[in-house]
Swiss-Prot record:
EC code: 3.1.26.4
GO cellular component: cytoplasm; ribonuclease H2 complex
Cofactor-binding details, from the entry: Manganese or magnesium. Binds 1 divalent metal ion per monomer in the absence of substrate. May bind a second metal ion after substrate binding.
Species in which this protein is naturally found: Thermococcus sibiricus (strain DSM 12597 / MM 739)
Name of the encoding gene: rnhB
Name assigned to this protein: Ribonuclease HII
Length: 224
């Protein structure tokens, strides 16, 4: 039996791409992946993920990786869940070898619903198991999570070569917020690598505008 796994990396960040990866693994190879130490990418060091990336590529029967830019995300119609459903299906349909069973790391609060709507968009008819934290339960999803995470990490490293230290790209990262604020102060706009539909940017704009207004008021009072 051919087992499929699909996962994403970079759903929440304000900077950089969303990466979706899928793999197909023959059931007979699962033990080889376990022996390699393949597990949820979040539980592995960056170095270990990179080592496993190449080994996974060699061992899987098939794989497909889709990198979606901030522009792709901003142009979406509907919610992020709708966007992920559409692109999860796109990635699975792009596999040359179709799995008989697909494990999905569900992005919806309703796991079953997420699996159903993905299945409706597939060009083939596998059994679907959609669950939260599937990357920590099923080897095919763990392998896909590593491919997605390493691909996104490499994209972030390329951005750091251009823009300097941008942090992890997550809105909660102080380094990322500092980068966005300083870039906006210098250029009057945000860089092309950010998701303009994220509320984070509006909050930063409002904060900087407030600071500017306060500064202008202080200067006015000093002169008067």
């Amino acid at each position: 039996m051919k087992l499929g796994g699909i996962d994403e990396a970079g759903r929440g960040p304000v900077v950089g791409p969303l990466v979706i990866a899928a793999v197909v693994i023959d059931e007979s190879k699962i033990e080889k992946f376990e022996a390699l130490g393949v597990k949820d990418s979040k539980k592995l060091s960056p170095k270990k993920r990179e080592e496993l990336f190449e080994k996974i590529i060699e061992l899987v029967d098939d794989y497909f990786i889709l990198e979606l830019s901030p522009e792709d995300i901003d142009k979406r119609e509907g919610t992020m869940n709708d966007f992920e459903v559409e692109n999860f299906a796109k990635v699975l349909n792009s596999l040359k070898i179709k799995p008989d069973l697909v494990y999905i790391d569900a992005a919806d609060v309703n796991e079953e619903r997420f699996g159903i709507v993905v299945r409706e968009k597939l060009s083939f008819y596998p059994k679907i198991i959609a669950e939260h934290k599937a990357d920590s339960k099923y080897i095919p999803v763990a392998a896909a999570s590593i491919l997605a995470k390493v691909t996104r990490d490499k994209a972030i490293e390329r951005l750091k070569e251009i823009y300097g230290n941008i942090g992890s790209g997550y809105p909660s990262d102080p380094i990322t917020r500092k980068f966005l604020e300083e870039y906006y102060k210098e250029h009057g706009s945000f860089p092309p690598v950010v998701r303009r539909s994220w509320k984070t940017l509006k909050k930063i704009e409002e904060k900087l505008q407030k600071e500017k207004n306060q500064s202008n008021l202080l200067n006015f009072l000093k002169k008067s």
